[in-house]
Amino acid sequence: MEYLEKYEEWCNGEIFDNETKEELLGIKENESEIKDRFYKDLEFGTAGLRGIIGAGTNRMNKYTVTKATQGLANYILKQEGQDKGVAIAFDSRRMSPEFSEQAALCLNANGIKTYIFESLRPTPELSFTVRKLGCIAGIVITASHNPPEYNGYKVYWEDGAQIVSPKDKEIITEVNNVTAVSYTHL
């Protein structure tokens, strides 16, 4: 699917909220902006996702976060780790609490227990919590050192460390293979 088709799908699709559609309609005359937002999917790399916050497949938003979380959920289910749960932390960046909630709702819809912090926490506290609670994984919503318009999504495994080979590649494969997501509404 070409970037203009993806743009139209996001502008008209029933699954996309009005706020997302309004943001995209605001750029309808700016083809270079549309192309930048839709020419590819935001890549789930070795440590997770990182990108500019906004509407589009190449941006950090609730839809790309949910897709990444669905891939992680699929991997956890294959490992039979749903009962161990996933700890979720977030920093002070824009949309961090919302993205952490999106991740929890997706994991819960897949039958995976979650432990989500009520307020912002540093990454080392997430790492400690994963080990202390015996979780199979952890997620931190943070863009670390990137500019303020960015946010990110980092995955940690049951040892409290960021995912490394071969798990990173296996999770990336699951994320890239997502065609549908499970989601629980509040």
Model features per residue range: what roles?
Residues 8-13, 81-158:
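Ferredoxin-reductase
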Residues 184-185:
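Conserved small/polar residues in nucleotide/adenosyl-binding loops
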Residues 8-103:
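An N-terminal, well-structured beta->alpha segment
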Residues 91, 174-177, 181:
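N-terminal segments that mediate ammonia production and transfer
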Residues 1-3:
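Polybasic, low-complexity association/targeting segments
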Residues 52-53, 149-150, 164-166:
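Short helix/loop capping segments that flank catalytic or ligand/cofactor-binding pockets
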